[in-house]
């Protein structure tokens, strides 16, 4: 993963050449760069990334381009505050982090449509672009949504599902504790109640709605991109995050799914356990079951985290190689490392990439270079399939219902632990 907007243009060509020398043949760009294309509402400029892609095309590097909707610009959220996300009490998540928008504000859907259309038209025929990533980590950070736009859309979702309030009241058992609804406007996504205990059937439908909203938003991108892109250019996004039916997302809004693999998440806080850095194998097994192929869009390559949360120790010598081969052994046809060089500013100032702040070669770069040489001998493995002897049925309704069910919920933990260990 590479961020040309973080670095002086004089570094670009040398960075690309060093990556290619290390066996890195594809980079992902632009997922957080909306302002570089639309710094003022309705005024589109492409010169920055045009210059970067011109440099890329001096080399053999390939590019995965992104739609930059994970971080809407300040001008947008200031002028249209209804696009902002909210917590369960209605407190707004303001500009300054990421994933602070909601999927259902009509104005955000329109602004998304416009920026994706502009980018797809402008970059559709760039020969270095082999694929596109939609947004970035849909439902990461926030997997439940409580903005006003979400509640309005939730009522539409329920009307389409149940047709009448009588049928909804019957399905939800609202006669219990006098919860009966007599008007659609009385229904909200789960709000705080005594002991934070809401109607369990409303709760499950809300999680289904969150998934539906995510899939619909992803499909908005996908349909626009597919309209403009050459047939050999793929469209993907990452998983696995809360409250998304990834089998439907894959079938309706992606060519294939990718995964962000950070095996050391939280290891410092959780204490010693020889299996902890390999718990990601369970997720790799899950994503393997979503479609016929998958890739790793972000493979951990260094220590770190955000400046105020998420701790990851430095990978031991050989550990990046272990994780890379673990992904390949689980069926990954593509592995990309996060990130090329550690950023010197911002929230992820401690989230190390392959290179440290000093930009000097190090043991992590050498390890990845060695992996690249080994991969040349293993290239025939890409795309290969095999006949699995065992399958595990994964049911999204059961998974989501178990999140708040004090009786059956704990079985999720024990079942997963048993399968993994």
PLM feature segments, named:
Residues 1-9, 30-49, 94-113, 138-143, ...:
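The substrate-binding groove and active-site-proximal loops of carbohydrate-active enzymes
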Residues 187, 219, 231-232, 241, ...:
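Carbohydrate-binding surfaces of carbohydrate-active enzymes
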Residues 5-21, 112-118, 239-250, 315-326, ...:
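Short, acidic/polar
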Residues 3-5, 30-33, 66-75, 130-139, ...:
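Short, solvent-exposed turn/loop segments enriched in Gly/Ser/Thr/Pro and often Arg
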Residues 23-25, 57-63, 125-130, 229-234, ...:
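Short, well-ordered coil/turn segments that N-cap beta-strands
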Residues 89-256, 260-273, 277-282:
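Polysaccharide-binding and catalytic clefts of secreted carbohydrate-active enzymes
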Residues 19, 27, 56, 119, ...:
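Conserved, mostly hydrophobic/aromatic
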Residues 12-93, 116-120, 221-229:
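Aromatic-lined substrate-binding rim segments of carbohydrate-active enzymes
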């Amino acid at each position: 993963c590479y961020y040309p907007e973080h670095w002086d243009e004089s570094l670009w060509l040398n960075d690309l050449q060093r990556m290619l020398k290390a066996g890195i043949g594809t980079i992902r760009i632009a997922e957080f760069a909306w302002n570089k294309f639309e710094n003022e509402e309705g005024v589109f400029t492409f010169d920055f990334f045009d210059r970067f892609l011109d440099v890329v095309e001096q080399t053999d590097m390939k590019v995965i381009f992104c739609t930059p909707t994970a971080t809407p610009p300040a001008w947008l959220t200031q002028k249209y505050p209804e696009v902002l996300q909210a917590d369960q009490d209605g407190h707004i998540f303001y500009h300054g982090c990421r994933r602070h928008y909601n999927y259902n504000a009509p104005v955000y859907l329109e602004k998304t449509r416009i920026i994706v259309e502009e980018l797809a038209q402008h970059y559709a025929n760039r020969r270095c672009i082999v694929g596109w990533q939609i947004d970035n980590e849909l439902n990461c950070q926030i997997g439940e949504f409580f903005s006003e736009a979400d509640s309005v859309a939730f009522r539409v979702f329920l009307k389409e599902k149940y047709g009448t309030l009588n049928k909804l009241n019957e399905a939800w058992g609202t006669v219990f504790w006098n919860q009966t609804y007599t008007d659609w406007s009385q229904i909200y996504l789960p709000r705080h109640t005594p002991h934070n205990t809401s109607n369990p059937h409303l709760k499950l439908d809300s999680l289904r709605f969150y998934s539906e909203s995510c899939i619909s938003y992803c499909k908005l991108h996908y349909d626009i991109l597919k309209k403009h892109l050459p047939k050999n250019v793929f469209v993907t996004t990452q998983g696995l995050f809360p409250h998304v039916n990834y089998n439907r997302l894959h079938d309706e809004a992606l060519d294939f799914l990718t995964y962000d693999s950070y095996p050391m998440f939280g290891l410092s806080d959780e204490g010693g356990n020889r299996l902890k850095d390999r718990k990601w194998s369970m997720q790799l097994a899950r994503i393997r079951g979503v479609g016929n192929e998958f890739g790793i869009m972000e493979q951990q390559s260094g220590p770190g985290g955000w400046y105020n949360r998420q701790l990851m120790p430095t990978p031991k010598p050989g550990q990046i190689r272990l994780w890379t081969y673990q992904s390949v052994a689980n069926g990954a046809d593509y592995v990309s490392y996060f990130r090329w060089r550690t950023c010197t500013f911002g929230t992820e100032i401690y989230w190390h990439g392959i290179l440290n702040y000093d930009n000097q070669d190090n043991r992590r770069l050498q390890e990845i270079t060695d992996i690249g040489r080994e991969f040349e001998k293993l290239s025939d493995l890409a795309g290969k399939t095999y006949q699995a002897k065992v399958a595990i049925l994964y049911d999204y309704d059961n998974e989501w219902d178990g999140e708040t069910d004090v009786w059956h919920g704990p079985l999720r933990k024990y079942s997963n632990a048993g399968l993994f260990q």
